[in-house]
Amino acid sequence: MSEKEGKVIPETNGMKRPRFDPVKLGLPEEFTLTDYTRLKGCSCKVPQPELLALLQSVSTTPGRRDVGMDCSIVKLQHKDETGKPLYMVSTTDFFFPSVEDPYLQGQIGAANVLSDLYSTGIDRCDTVLMLLAASTDMDKTEREVCTQEMMKGFVDHVRLAGSDVTGGQTVMNPWPLIGGIATSVVAESQMIRPTGLQPGDILVLTKPLGCQIAVNLKQWLRRPSPIFEEQIQGKMDSEEIEELYNAAADGMKRLNRMAAALMHSHGAHGATDVTGFGILGHAKNLGSAQKADVCLVLDSLPMYRGAVKASKLMGDKYRLFEGYAAETSGGLLVAFGTREEAEGYIRELYETDGEPAWVVGRVVRREGSAPYALLQKDYKIIEVGAKVNDKII
């Protein structure tokens, strides 16, 4: 993306890339990056219940309800030219490979770390540090090629987002790793804190669900697993799986930057991005951070069509239908005060970014010991197909 007259405008240069060909990079024909990890993308996160238990033993800032949300928001000693306080908003994220192509993996890594900033309505990142691990399980040539390609993809995507990589850390590790630290210094008016949801708010999601299923199926297509052979093979063909994987890969590398920029003009009350805890896990986290006592009720969920089919065949092994399937570089879950504001946001996002978004629920008053978020029992699944000639089929 680039800036024009102070506005974020869409920019697709660099987003399209030929299909991954390892031989052209000097790698073996059968090379695939996901062979070098057992935990893919954001599914490598410590499970949410375990993480919450660990955090209880660590002293955090007393009285802060947003501790544990996507970003750290710290008031600085410095002020802007009008004397108003400035805030440092920072986040870090990294993960193991989820796709076969190291360049694409770098793009996804950049989109994922920037997404945490975007969830606070910040669409301009001041600086990014890159965190990288080169794989000791690869031979020297494979390691050099893959590390360089991941770095290129990461740096190119950060530049596409209007920022620069200004440093970082690179280490050796059996599994490759990519991620970073994103930081912006902003005034209060330039961000939307994640604590302002109110009963009656309407919830919008900006990307479909089902990435984890997509990347697993893609790997199983090349290296069949017992579950693939027993439950998928013969019931989903390679074309269906490739279509699902390509749609998910495009979604994972897509920046949430425009979605962040439009939050301000449509009166968003707060947001989170959907990653390793699944949509319901992140909705619960968002609900628990609110000043008001609220519950987020999800009544419709957009899912990639192929992921829906595969999940049914596997008995919902990855808990997609429960709302707990891990997503990598997923969409923003945004709350708006009225349905008109939510629909206006969806419409403008499609007009400017060319991508759909969906109303997925509402915010209600939380009663007693009710959960901070829940899936409505009869919730609707919206099946999302591949994108052909810029139309969703």
UniProtKB/Swiss-Prot annotation:
Positions of the record's site feature: Important for catalytic activity: K45
Stretch list, region Disordered: 1-21
List of residues binding ATP: K45, G68, M69, D70, D93, D116, G167, G168, Q169, T170
Keywords noted in UniProt: ATP-binding, Kinase, Magnesium, Metal-binding, Nucleotide-binding, Selenium, Transferase
Inactivation phenotype: RNAi-mediated knock down in procyclic and blood stream forms (strain 29-13) impairs growth following prolonged exposure to oxidative stress.
Any one cellular-component term (Gene Ontology): nucleoplasm
Organism domain of life: Eukaryota
Active site residues according to the UniProt entry: C42
EC number, UniProt record: 2.7.9.3
Binding-site residues for Mg(2+), renumbered to this chain: D70, D116, D273
SUPFAM superfamilies: PurM C-terminal domain-like (SSF56042), PurM N-terminal domain-like (SSF55326)
Cross-referenced Pfam families: AIRS, AIRS_C
The protein's required cofactors: Mg(2+)
Binding note for cofactor: Binds 1 Mg(2+) ion per monomer.
Molecular function GO labels: ATP binding; metal ion binding; selenide, water dikinase activity
Oligomer status and interactors: Homodimer.
Family matches, as PANTHER family: INACTIVE SELENIDE, WATER DIKINASE-LIKE PROTEIN-RELATED, SELENIDE, WATER DIKINASE
Protein name: Selenide, water dikinase
Species of origin: Trypanosoma brucei brucei (strain 927/4 GUTat10.1)
Taxonomic lineage from the root: Eukaryota, Discoba, Euglenozoa, Kinetoplastea, Metakinetoplastina
